[in-house]
Amino acid sequence: MKTPENLEEPSATPNPSRTPTERFVYLEALLEGGAPWGFTLKGGLERGEPLIISKIEEGGKADSVSSGLQAGDEVIHINEVALSSPRREAVSLVKGSYKTLRLVVRRDVCAAPGHADPGTSKSLSSELLTCSPQHRKATWSGGVKLRLKQRCSEPATRPHSWHTTKFGETQPDVSMMQISQGTMGPPWHQSYHSSSSTSDLSNYDHAYLRRSPDQCSSQGSMESLEPSGGYPPCHLLSPAKSTSSIDQLGHLHNKRDSAYSSFSTSSSIFEYPPPGGSARERSGSMDVISARGGLLEGMRQADIRYVKTVYDTRRGVSSEYEVNPSALLLQGRDAHASADSQGCAKWHSIPRGKGTPSPSWSQQCSGSLETATDNLPQKAGAPLPPTRSDSYAAFRHRERPSSWSSLDQKRFCRPQTNSSGSQKTPFAEDQLHTVPERSPENSPPVKSKHNYTQKAQPGQPLLPTGIYPVPSPEPHFAQVPQPSVSSNGTVYPALVKESGYTAAQGTCNKMATLDENGNQNEASRPGFAFCQPLEHNSVTPVEKRPEPTAKYIYKVHFSSVPENEDSSLKRHITPPHGHSPYPSERKNIHGGSRACSNHHSLSSPQAQALHVGDDRRPSRLSQPWEGDFQEDHNANLRQKVEREGQGQGLSGNSGRTRSAFSSLQNIPESLRRQSNVELGEAQEVHPGGRSKVEDPGRKAGASDIRGYLDRSVSYPRPEGKMNAVDSVHSADSRYEESPAPALPQTSGASQRRLSSSSSAAPQYRKPHCSVLEKVSRIEEREQGRHRPLSVGSSAYGPGYRPGRTGPTPSTSSSDLDDPKAGSVHFSESTEHLRNGEQNPPNGEAKQEEASRPQCSHLIRRAPADGRGPPARGGEPSRPEARLLRSQSTFQLYSEAEREASWSEDRPGTPESPLLDAPFSRAYRNSIKDAQSRVLGATSFRRRDLEPGTPATSRPWRPRPASAHVGMRSPEAAVPSSSPHTPRERHSVTPAAPQAARRGPRRRLTVEQKKRSYSEPEKMNEVGVSEEAEPTPCGPPRPAQPRFSESTVADRRRIFERDGKACSTLSLSGPELKQFQQSALADYIQRKTGKRPTGAACTPEAGLRERAQSAYLQAGPAAPDGPGLASACSLSSLREPEALPRKEHTHPSAADGPQAPRDRSSSFASGRLVGERRRWDPQVPRQLLSGANCEPRGVQRMDGAPGGPPSWGMVAGKAGKSKSAEDLLERSDTLAVPVHVRSRSSPTSDKKGQDVLLREGSNFGFVKDPCCLAGPGPRSLSCSDKGQNELALPLHHPTPCWNGSGCKATVASSAPPESSGAADHLKQRRAPGPRPLSAGMHGHFPDARAASLSSPLPSPVPSASPVPSSYRSQLAMDQQTGQQPPSSPASAVTQPTSPRSPELSSPAYGLGEGMWKRTSLPQRPPPPWVKWAHAVREDGLAEDTLAPEFANLKHYRNQPSRPSSCSTSDPDTPGRISLRISESALQPSPPPRGDYDDEVFMKDLHPKVTSSPTFEALPPPPPPSPPSEEPLVNGTDDFPPPPPPQALCEVLLDGEASTEAGSGPCRIPRVMVTREGHVPGAAHSEGSQIMTATPPQTSAKGSEAESNTPSSASAQPQLNGSPGKQLCPSQTRNLTYEPVERTQDLGKKTHAEPQKTSEDIRTEALAKEIVHQDKSLADILDPDSRMKTTMDLMEGLFPGDASVLMDSGAKRKALDITARRAGCEAKASDHKEAVSVLVNCPAYYSVSAAKAELLNKIKDMPEELQEEEGQEDVNEKKAELIGSLTHKLESLQEAKGSLLTDIKLNNALGEEVEALISELCKPNEFDKYKMFIGDLDKVVNLLLSLSGRLARVENVLRGLGEDASKEERSSLNEKRKVLAGQHEDARELKENLDRRERVVLDILANYLSAEQLQDYQHFVKMKSTLLIEQRKLDDKIKLGQEQVRCLLESLPSDFRPKAGAISLPPALTGHATPGGTSVFGGVFPTLTSPL
């Protein structure tokens, strides 16, 4: 079909170069039958030429009369995807066409006058209203996505097939792009074979859309994508069922695809922004948008018959609806025109949003993109080179697979210059929306969220009604334009364009152009128009029209995109605005002037460039901003209207817009018809009706900005009617809601429209209102307008995808703070964000910018909160959020909203893909996740996960926007539905797909990996959470503090998002969150006997928050929930608690900091925390600012939920985290969970419940001490790693715990900590006390509130005051579940900068394990472990604690390792590790975690009291008693901890003052716990543990005491020194802690358990003898660190020690007794002396030959200077021989006892075997027998190899300089062989472990619990006893060898004065060298079996 293109609207013309309307005719060609299509494409963006059909093969499909294609035709759209011009893109699209290929080509009428026959032209014209090329372009951009349903000459259905489409002649590529369906090679083959697409687009589209955009490319476009260097035509791809579109998008978007990685993301995102604004974000490159616009335009014309494929995620069905091309085209043209002029601006704004110079990049991108996209002369303008900043952002995004690909961004950048319209067009299109989301700014991503809603529409069948309750969470069609639910974005391009078309039609009638919002729908701003209030648009219809070119385009994009996208657009626009070269623009935006609004869209560099001279530039800025926002909302409304039915009686414009949208998206022909008609008439109507509404709305908004803000708030806001409408149309309502704030009337109209159109709307609105809005209102009220900025950002959150966080944070903070301001401020914030992100329009904008990081977070959270202040009561909180909620759960809503908002914050971030993830969440996401993981792990991880670096560049393009959009949008819910989407995967809740991966795969921290292993199903959460978080971590983090104003849940969500780099990933569906919350609450109740409630019960609060997501905090909780829930799932193990803590802490401080807590669950989160902290300078600023800091925190905590309720919400957040953890409770069992528990929700829970109690408890010492320890130490080790790690734990104390930052934070001097402290603040989220103060009050409304307020100041001022204030903080932390531990631990630990973290870890209660971690500065996670202990203290008896500690020990060990890894990651370690630990701590540890904070603080004090205390702290962990072994085991992965004393000193230094007051109370418990766990650790009675653990100490009390001195000194040496060994009794005492015992036992066996006086004396004697007789040094040297068999066996049987402990307690006791007896006999003053036998593993160090040589040497007469001296030495030798003999006797007794144990165990094994043989099947019994037999063999093999290897290594080590090379090489060879064998044996052991699990699973089906325990005991004891036996044998042999050497060294005539020397039986016959049997016999030759 041919359609003359009207170029009437110059303003709409992106490129002035466009020729007049009459010159070009647009033809749609439908080729059917599949490839080859019979034409060749040439030119393209790569060549700087338009994509031209260079050749049409005769007889080919393209040569058919029906196609009407001619050589020379410029391809504008392929499969309804506007081309961005890269031929590769076109080829990809063509190849992506399966059976049908729809081309819209532009023919130069002048060149081929006869080609466009009037009929065709007319028909097309009817379908695609003739418009200026811009118009057409806008139309295409706006609506091209839709397939033209009825192309005059084409069948209704359009078959999808790949056809070769050479894109312009301008691209005469060497290889004509031959589009092969399956292949797309860089050199495009000319023959176009290969069926276009494997599956029909209708089917493909849905899945494709669902798939992350990147995955789309994998559809087949991936291949196509690769070759093309140009920008992906994703945005061009129509959401319609165009496989090619999808494929193209996919290939374009497949960032994951290595080849398409760069532009694949963008392209895939374009078509359908993933979640929320993700699509936009993903498509996220201006050029992509532009290309999309152009492509869409072309597609639109080509695909005159737009088939819209709607995939109903809920119903799991996809429907194709054809949309009337006329309406689409009209709208599309308008949209396209506006897109052309505005697409650029939009895109520009997006880049600007990124914080890069919007103008240059935008312009460049716009022109470039448009040129590439449309290939129209108008877009001929050379693309401006992308601004470095923008290009960087773009590239960066490219680097991030999940985000819009770099290509996307590139595209974004390039095309922008040529035509803002083009870019805008893409923007105008939903597709385009996706692109903006991708843009670094990610302003559109906010809209994308709304797109979610829209997506939901596509998810629903395209029905005339257009109101489908089914948000179609994730339509699987290319039209993901609306990142919200795919359904919204189903016809992404078309939808956007349709909105655009509506505008386009309106463009024809300028007045009629007014969209639903009364905005003038210009070609330029089709989407915008409906969004814009009449006030601006109507006022200057004509004037606006030019502006709309950019503005409308922008709006069109918004239009297409739901509010979310609108917000995104706003964001994008605003950033351009903010960055806009025109300060007036920003001011306008801020001022709310229409100009600002309009200019906003122009704000994009392109638009600005185009309209720089234009008056309407400012106007446009004002209007486009407003219009953008409105349009997006209007687009939502439109969509809703469309869904409802265009004829439903919505405003004509709204209806028309929706019609266009609908036809493109979900509306069938009727809708399309309406689109055509309504676009004409409804638009006019709207100018009257909707326009009026909007006008008043805008006026009511007081300013365009206000209107924008309102609008923006509208969707964020759940309160207005819009909410109800939103409920009905998740996507649409969202979209519509967006405008609500700005246009109360408009909002009302939209709401009415929506509510009338959708019954779900009220429902949604209710939930939103009730939960989200209520909470937000409450919190905001409480917080008052203290956080107006925050509110803006928060409200912005959902809408403000870009999350430019700069302005957003403050705005968000502000807005969120005020319930009323929530919505309004949100809008303002959004506007500010957009403006401020780039260049704050005013101080507020700048403030927002400063807080930008927070803003992003705030945004993420704010969405859940009332998106805006209640002031905009009429406005829906967050349409998208509401949609999400309506879709799934309130939680889903809030979660999605939060996610979306966060996504919005980071639309350009790698997380941006998260947005589209919900769309393509299915398969595509899976693929993308896999690819991203690889890429992220390799090259993207840093950017995605690293908070600092990525954050630095991402501040303006926080991932939150994209990710949030994705998460928040109804689509987010869909992803949950899509099992394929890994992101979604992590969201348990189907409706909470917000977890969609936004960016490239992020590298998982060890903690994350552990979580993923422990909870494989949450693997994606692991990656996503972190991914999402890292970007936001930067600028978004600062913004987060603003969220503190919002609901606690919201804040927590924000923080989760921050930390989330993990958060999004970890975000799970609201349902999951709720479930987790409930589970967590139950779990807490079970463990602590208290159900977390309100502030007191963080867990419940967390639960409530999660639940709140659904009910209490529907909006805020849910948004937070999603991020948090996911984080909980993903990182709930470690992050959840921290997050709750943080939340609690940070709610007081600023929610911004809290989010990281959850996020910290991910490794990225940890880092994010750090980055956040870095960005936190803004957070600190906000925090410092009274409103943001304490007021916000307090308000938010206290006020939002209503004082304590708010805290409860915070607790809820924590609970949420906890909830996730609760779900992960299973993981809690894991060692890692210990950290989490203590840090995360458990902390919140317990804190909430037991915080008061625990305030007096012992726990919290290490963690808090770290904080208190002082900034210095902490800042060193904790600051970075510890900080990240401990930051969360120390969040409350954050002030203390950042070195300088700590104190700054504590002092609430964010500015000081802006660098470090800010970072820490971010990490702690409530920068220390100040948030603590506020948060504490809120969190600890009971007792804490009061104390907290005062404590807060104290902690803030300094760490030392922490004792009382710290306690409060601890309380707060407990409530928050985060900071107190951080602060105290940090403070105490910090003094010892390196150890500080370690100390805090051990102090945490990790005991030895913690100490080990302590060695690792990253040990902070252990503090959580300690918290776990604390929990135990709280909830359990001392004994219980011991067992738990046993778990803790495991947990510690695991957490330790995670910690180690985490530790490596400053941010991750604490959070991740701790969170994971949290799970391990599952029972009481969670509460303990909170208490741990307090306890830690108090513990610190005792520790401060005595350095042993610190050691005691480490000892508390179960591993501690066996410090050496347990530590080794626990520290297997970690370096040994520094000497406990040093740590103690460090802790003591920090803790002395910190814990002085509060420490004592808690220390006892902690001590008890620790003491029980670590007898050795408890060695220092002064230590808290010892002091606090008298009961447990009773068992090990004496041991602990005796160990205390040696332990303190020995602990450091534990690993290698026998002296470090704890005495068996101690180990036995540890029996209650199996793990610890086991480790202890193993260690003890290896190293003497505890030094008795005899041991000390023996050691002293040995040293003296060695000093005088060097020949005995090797054998007797107590300090000898020779390797032993046990050294090499270490870690292989970590649990054996505990088992052995149980059964071998007797043996150990005997051993110890014998040893002690010997020691007593030989007791001496030499404390250092260690049992020579134990200390000197001469057996291992000396070979038998060498021993003989030594004997010979000793036989030689020793020349002593003095006979007396010689005699004295001989006497000592005799004494030592006697001592060793005693020891050997005791060892023999122990061996006898061990043999008895072995017999008993074997008997037990026989019983078990008999039982199993009777119960199990023969094959199962065989498995059991084989396993048992192999267990014996493998253990013995390992022992043998370990002994031999140790012996060889010792001999090698002992070789002298003179050793021959042969001997050395021989030994080396032996060692190599043995090492290989040992490694093989280890593998066998691993295999055996797997088999053991299999057997256990089998037996679990047959055996009772008791029988199963018997079996497990038997198996464990079997290996443990074997190892113990070998240990004893080695020790006996060593002792015998030592005795023999001593005897040989004695003179033959020597007679001891004491009388005959008693020799061990084996040596009684040994003859002295002289031959006299001095000892009554000749010693048998000792040979070392090893």
From Swiss-Prot:
Residues 357-376, 415-425, 595-607, 653-677, 1366-1399, 1581-1630 have a biased composition (Polar residues). Its main location: other. SUPFAM superfamilies: PDZ domain-like. Residues 747-761, 796-814, 865-874, 1114-1127, 1307-1318, 1455-1469 have a biased composition (Low complexity). The modification Phosphoserine is found at residues 212, 439, 443, 888, 912, 969, 1063, 1066, 1219. Keywords: Actin-binding, Cell junction, Cell membrane, Cell shape, Coiled coil, Cytoplasm, Cytoskeleton, Developmental protein, Membrane, Microtubule, Phosphoprotein. Residues 1659-1947 form the ASD2 domain. Residues 1-21, 152-199, 211-239, 265-285, 342-463, 564-1055, 1083-1102, 1107-1223, 1304-1425, 1446-1654 are annotated as: Disordered. GO terms for cellular component: adherens junction; apical junction complex; apical part of cell; apical plasma membrane; cytoplasm; cytoskeleton; microtubule. Residues 1513-1524 have a biased composition (Pro residues). Residues 927-1023 form the ASD1 domain. The keyword Nucleus does not apply. It comes from the Eukaryota. GO terms for biological process: actin cytoskeleton organization; apical protein localization; cell morphogenesis; cellular pigment accumulation; columnar/cuboidal epithelial cell development; neural tube closure; pattern specification process; regulation of cell shape. It is found in: Cell junction, Adherens junction; Cytoplasm, Cytoskeleton; Apical cell membrane. InterPro entries: ASD1_dom, ASD2_dom, PDZ, PDZ_sf, Shroom_fam. GO terms for molecular function: actin binding; actin filament binding. Residues 24-109 form the PDZ domain. Residues 430-440, 630-645, 774-785, 895-908, 1004-1020, 1134-1146, 1634-1654 have a biased composition (Basic and acidic residues). Interacts with F-actin. Interacts with ROCK1. The ASD1 domain mediates F-actin binding. The ASD2 domain mediates the interaction with ROCK1 and is required for apical constriction induction. Belongs to the shroom family. This is Protein Shroom3. It comes from Mus musculus.
